[in-house]
Amino acid sequence: MDDATPAEVIEVLKRTGMTGEVMQVKCRILDGRDKGRILTRNVMGPIREGDILMLLDTIREAKEIRTP
């Protein structure tokens, strides 16, 4: 994982997916070209504020979840 970029989860927004297994989070890039940038990403599995994600791609951003 030499090319992965660390990002800290700063806020857990919503749950999504068929059974709520995916969480949408806001995370701050900690290192690299986009240091300090805040992204919205979809994450599978248990996650909470303060966790560190290793992102392979810092360009993609998740779309906002719309509820009817």
UniProtKB/Swiss-Prot annotation:
GO terms for cellular component: cytosolic small ribosomal subunit. This is Small ribosomal subunit protein eS28. GO terms for molecular function: structural constituent of ribosome. It comes from Methanothermobacter thermautotrophicus (strain ATCC 29096 / DSM 1053 / JCM 10044 / NBRC 100330 / Delta H) (Methanobacterium thermoautotrophicum). Pfam families: Ribosomal_S28e. Keywords: Ribonucleoprotein, Ribosomal protein. Belongs to the eukaryotic ribosomal protein eS28 family. HAMAP family: Ribosomal_eS28. GO terms for biological process: maturation of SSU-rRNA; ribosomal small subunit assembly; translation.
